[in-house]
């Protein structure tokens, strides 16, 4: 950044600087308008920002236009007027705020804010020229990548713009505090966690409310969500660790039982609402180990022990704003409870204990994390390698005690460190083999684990999959070296301004799992649950990369600014930039990625995730209350997926869908012992709209009684005649 970033007072701002600033603001508005027009003129580009319905309204397509029309016209003049007005208002208001905060003249603040801030607006249109150039040069991969990621480019420019404003507005009193010694360290450290508690509390309230509204509105599926609550109910009532989606115990699906630790709470409040509250709380509390690890890494630099608190708090807030983490709370398909989510705070706590070098805490953390899912063992292999080769490269902190030190007695020498790390790696491989090749097949009566079909291109069993990868490396590298892989990485790293890349050894711990996820044919983006283990590794790498990011920014400032600028000014400014860049990058990428209230889809009327469609009053939810009393709790009920959650406390709750189920004799339809059949006709995935379309009632009318409709056709209730 230019030297003007550091000037605190100037009474002789030259007219040339003011004119130059105005020109940059005007140029930024024009170039940004050009880029926005390009994005909005194409349906395929615009839907990275808005819903197809909103795009059709923006370009004013006629009602009868074909739904697959990809081009539309957006007035460049209209965009210039809007962005020009935004530019003028934010330029003038921002300069006023900067002047008040810094104690500088308004003209100086106006010139500096315009020159530096609107450089980011000019960068918006660089995307367009790069995209055009890639097309002309035949770089189809680059062109394709740019076409699916303009939202990340815009988010980066917005984050840079906000970071510039907040850095320029750093008050004189703040700079004075930064220049002091660390005598205020303890009082500041005591205050900072209060803000962290507040941020976590806001997250818990918001996401618990959203999850509960989905439940009340019958928009939460049973499969891969409420089925986990059924596990707890069945265990509590002596039916075994199972869901009646299929016969057999759940260990045939995954070695996953972390949610059983909720049984004491569940016994007091047996409701799925409790599970949603616990999951949101657990995810939010993951911000604390992020804070602790980041602060520890930064505090090792004696130049800024105090500022480590602020940077660590920014990292923790970025974690709460991080879209891939939020998708573990509410997935893109509205699956809201996944035990995998508990692995994020558990693994973060384990890594925190590892950094503190607490042997007992680390071992307990590793053991509990393995209860989340067998996938976490994939991380422990490379983590063992990291311990073996890099684990002792970081100095012991002052809080490390000789009695509890991870390295004391266990890793005092290179050989012992190497053996401990390799032992963890060998254990992880053995555990993964035992889980997938022995335990799970045994609970499946010898059948192959179900997720081998996610890698159907490579084979039908783990042995075939590995064999194909070794014998056909071209197929493997073709799948890995793709636009989808790069986009996946961008979606994980861009929200953190790519700072985790500055800690490559830590980030490499997640590389094998990331490669596996890129081969997954079911989902190749961080909007489901598969990426959960990577979230913890990425924030661990963020903690390790932040000190290097601060140093990198400091060197850039020293190179770009006047030699007379004091080094301590470079230090404080670089820390301020990194502090704001972390959370603004997470916030701005979330505008286009997350479906929370901070995301555009939440407010886009044409979006499937608009707040009124998902969380507002629901006619389906109101009418369902009329039929629930008709079905006794001791009955066996088959139901469609989105009403199934309301029957998990009945004697049996069966899935009614097009899938073949073992409980139904490996055929579609209901099991023979079913007493009631409940069908939801008005969910957007519903295929049956009337009783005449129900195969059981249509083919065997003498066996079923159609109960009177009291729901205006929203639900069909059939009772088996006995």
Name each region found by the language model.
Residues 140-157, 287, 378, 507-557, ...:
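Hydrophobic/aromatic-rich transmembrane helices and adjacent perimembrane loops
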Residues 31-44, 210, 220, 416-502, ...:
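Membrane-lumen/periplasm interface segments of specific transmembrane helices
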Residues 289, 339-365, 390, 537:
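Specific aromatic-rich, kink-prone transmembrane helix
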Residues 256-263, 272-276, 283-289, 312-349, ...:
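Aromatic- and kink-enriched transmembrane "portal" helix at the membrane-lumen/periplasm boundary
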Residues 88-99, 273, 277-302:
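Transmembrane-helix motifs of polytopic, lipid-linked glycan transferases
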Residues 111-119, 194-201, 310-313, 425-429, ...:
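Signature aromatic-anchored transmembrane alpha helix within multi-pass, membrane-resident enzymes
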Residues 108, 116, 285-326, 344-345, ...:
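Transmembrane-helix signature of polytopic, membrane-embedded enzymes
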Residues 1-31, 79-119, 135, 141-207, ...:
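Start-transfer (signal-anchor) and selected internal transmembrane alpha helices
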């Amino acid at each position: 950044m230019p030297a003007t970033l550091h000037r605190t007072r100037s009474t002789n701002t030259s007219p040339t600087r003011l004119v130059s600033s105005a020109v940059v603001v005007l140029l930024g508005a024009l170039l940004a308008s050009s880029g926005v027009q390009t994005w909005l003129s194409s349906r395929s580009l615009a839907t990275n920002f808005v819903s197809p319905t909103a795009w059709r309204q923006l370009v004013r397509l006629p009602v009868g236009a074909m739904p697959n029309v990809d081009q539309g016209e957006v007035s460049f003049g209209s965009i210039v007027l809007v962005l020009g007005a935004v530019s003028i208002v934010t330029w003038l208001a921002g300069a006023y705020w900067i002047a008040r905060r810094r104690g500088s003249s308004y003209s100086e603040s106006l010139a500096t804010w315009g020159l530096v801030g609107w450089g980011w607006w000019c960068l918006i249109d660089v995307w367009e020229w790069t995209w055009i150039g890639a097309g002309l040069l035949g770089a189809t991969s680059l062109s394709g990548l740019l076409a699916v990621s303009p939202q990340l480019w815009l988010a980066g420019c917005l984050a840079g713009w906000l970071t510039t404003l907040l850095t320029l507005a750093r008050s004189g009193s703040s700079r004075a505090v930064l220049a002091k010694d660390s005598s205020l360290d303890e009082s500041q450290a005591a205050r900072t966690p209060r803000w962290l508690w507040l941020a976590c509390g806001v997250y818990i309230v918001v996401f618990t409310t959203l999850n509960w509204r989905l439940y009340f509105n019958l928009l939460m599926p049973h499969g891969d969500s409420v089925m986990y609550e059924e596990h707890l109910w069945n265990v509590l009532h002596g039916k075994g660790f199972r869901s009646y989606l299929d016969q057999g115990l759940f260990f045939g699906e995954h070695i996953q039982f972390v949610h059983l630790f909720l049984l004491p709470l569940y016994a007091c409040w047996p409701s799925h609402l409790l599970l949603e509250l616990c999951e949101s709380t657990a995810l939010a509390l993951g911000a604390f180990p992020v804070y602790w690890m980041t602060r520890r890494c930064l505090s090792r630099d004696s130049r800024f022990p105090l500022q480590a608190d602020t940077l660590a708090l920014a990292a923790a807030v970025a974690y709460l704003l991080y879209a891939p983490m939020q998708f573990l709370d509410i997935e893109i398909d509205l699956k809201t409870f996944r035990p995998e989510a508990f692995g994020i705070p558990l693994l973060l706590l384990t890594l925190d204990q590892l950094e503190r070098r607490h042997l007992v805490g680390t071992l307990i953390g590793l053991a509990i994390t393995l209860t989340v899912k067998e996938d976490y063992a994939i991380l422990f292999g490379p983590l063992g390698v990291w311990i073996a080769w890099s684990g002792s490269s970081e100095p012991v902190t002052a809080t490390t005690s000789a009695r509890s030190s991870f390295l004391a007695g266990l890793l005092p020498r290179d050989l012992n460190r190497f053996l401990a790390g390799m032992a963890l790696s060998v254990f992880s491989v053995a555990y993964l083999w035992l889980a997938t090749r022995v335990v799970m097949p045994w609970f499946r009566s010898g059948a192959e684990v179900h997720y081998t079909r996610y890698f159907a291109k490579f084979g039908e069993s783990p042995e075939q999959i590995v064999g194909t990868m070794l014998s056909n490396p071209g197929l493997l590298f073709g799948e890995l070296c793709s636009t989808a892989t790069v986009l996946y990485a961008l979606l994980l790293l861009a929200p953190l301004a790519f700072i985790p890349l500055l800690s490559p050894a830590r980030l490499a711990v997640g590389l094998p799992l990331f490669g596996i996820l890129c081969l997954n044919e079911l989902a190749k983006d961080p909007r489901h649950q598969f990426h959960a283990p990577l979230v913890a590794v990425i924030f661990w790498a963020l903690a390790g990369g932040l000190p290097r990011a601060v140093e990198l920014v400091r060197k850039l400032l020293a190179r770009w600014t006047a030699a007379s600028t004091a080094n301590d000014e470079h230090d404080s400014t670089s820390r301020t930039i990194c502090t704001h860049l972390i959370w603004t990058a997470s916030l701005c990428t979330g505008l286009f990625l997350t479906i929370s209230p901070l995301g555009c889809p939440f407010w886009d009327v044409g979006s499937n995730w608009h707040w009124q469609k998902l969380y507002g009053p629901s006619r389906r939810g109101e009418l369902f209350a009329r039929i629930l009393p008709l079905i006794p709790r001791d009955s066996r009920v088959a139901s469609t997926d989105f009403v199934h959650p309301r029957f998990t406390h009945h004697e049996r709750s069966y899935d009614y869908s097009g899938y073949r189920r073992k409980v139904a004799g490996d055929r579609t339809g209901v099991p023979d012992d079913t007493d009631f059949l409940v069908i939801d006709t008005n969910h957007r995935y519903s295929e049956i709209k009337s009783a005449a379309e129900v195969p059981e009632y249509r083919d065997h009318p003498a066996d079923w009684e159609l109960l009177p409709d009291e729901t205006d056709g929203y639900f069909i209730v059939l009772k088996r005649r006995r």
